[in-house]
């Protein structure tokens, strides 16, 4: 049946008896049809009236665009967070960590809440409900939610970020740097098969995940200068070890090995009981030739830390030892950033430790500036 002309829009009765409504938008000149055929003219008229009202109020956008926006605004915090994590260019271990914080602390309370309905009051109640028993995990979960909501602002799902809780910066660990002599004592207590890992971590500042993915093909050595080409990292994701990109783009870097450590690595590589042949052979492994796990290395390393009376130290502190030693050797902040694979000076500075012996040396040199020889 032909369309019946009206003052605005048109109605067409189909063979089925249902009514099809449409109109030509004065905004873009395109014809738009109702989302469905209506049972009666009254319902079709109502749809046309609502569209005309949007045009008159200068609020009109194409129906498909409105439907897409409505669907997006209905997405829940859990759905959006999962999408956010999946789309981020993050190392596998980082994605797993974010997913864990979200699964344990965000989804149980806020997961079913539409992103568009998130408010500062909801965030404050969620924050208070987590309690203060696990401050680090609580802070990390909040940081994940805040980052997710920042993207929601960019996607125009919310007008502003509802995460506005002022957090005190976590207290920095006051850790004194190890001396080379103490490092030797620590290494002496570590299982001999992968003892070289202690020296590599401490003198090159590699992350543990970077070290356990270094292969023979990643070692460039002309007999005088040795470089480790950091290109990949390994991390535990759930029950599996996943090899992927390094933590950041800057983390892909060549790291020059101090000559005395390079000599240790050459000796280690020449021992077929410690490293297999072939370009894909891992530099450090278990006695069975498998990838060295963080837990196994930690158990061995803790014995060394206990030997020097420093049970508070962790694996990652060896990276900070390396940053400190490099700074003491004269590395600039920019050079430290490159060596550690950091993107900001703040992060490079954060990894440096204080040294009592170094402080005494600085004090002596200050007296020398005054023309006084101690």
Swiss-Prot record:
A GO BP entry: DNA integration
Pfam families reported for this sequence: Phage_integrase
One term of GO molecular function: transferase activity
Transmembrane feature ranges: none
Keyword Hydrolase part of the UniProt annotation: yes
Database matches in InterPro entries: CB, DNA_brk_join_enz, Integrase-like_cat_sf, Integrase_catalytic, Integrase_recombinase_N, Tyrosine_recombinase_XerCD
KW DNA-binding (keyword) present: yes
Function: Integrase is necessary for integration of the phage into the host genome by site-specific recombination.
The protein, known as: Integrase
Species of the source: Mycobacterium phage D29
Lineage of the organism: Viruses, Duplodnaviria, Heunggongvirae, Uroviricota, Caudoviricetes
